Amino acid sequence: ACDQGPQMLWMKKYQPEILKESATAFHCKDWLYFNLTGVRATDPTESVFSCGDFRERDFSDEVIELLGLTEQKALFPKVVDGTKVSHPLSDNVARLCGLQSGIPVVLGYVDVICTALGSGLYDPGYQTGCTIIGSTGMHMRYDDSVDEVKLNQESTGYTMVFPVDGTYSQMQSNMAATLNI
């Protein structure tokens, strides 16, 4: 599930007791990473998509405050860039899976960004684009730098960090893509 900021805001209003008992606000893959490594973390794309600043590749104190989640800020895990950092598979999980303890585990970026990377969206020096059609339709273009990011007057879409420092993807989504085929 994405959009953690608004989800936490809803929980603050309708399920405050659950939010008060919470230790960390994980995305699904972040919870898996925690169970594999014992490290509470999220990646730059999840932090930006939740309530972050794409320029900083991290959560934004200003956005968290605007959402009214200052008291819940500690629930957001630290941001770890899986292109640079890994953590070892825990001894217990290794034993349960029949794997060697300490194998590096990498925290991946959001699926849509990884799909765009695989489709060839990353092409420095070119204004490339791609569309991903699944349950959601993502229409994306690549930006070589923060200076190339152009926010539109309608304030639609969003900007995600790419798994290469200083690069971005601007995105518009259609939340029912394959239903329209």
Task: List each model region and its residues.
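Gly/Ser/Thr-rich active-site cleft segment
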Residues: 1-110
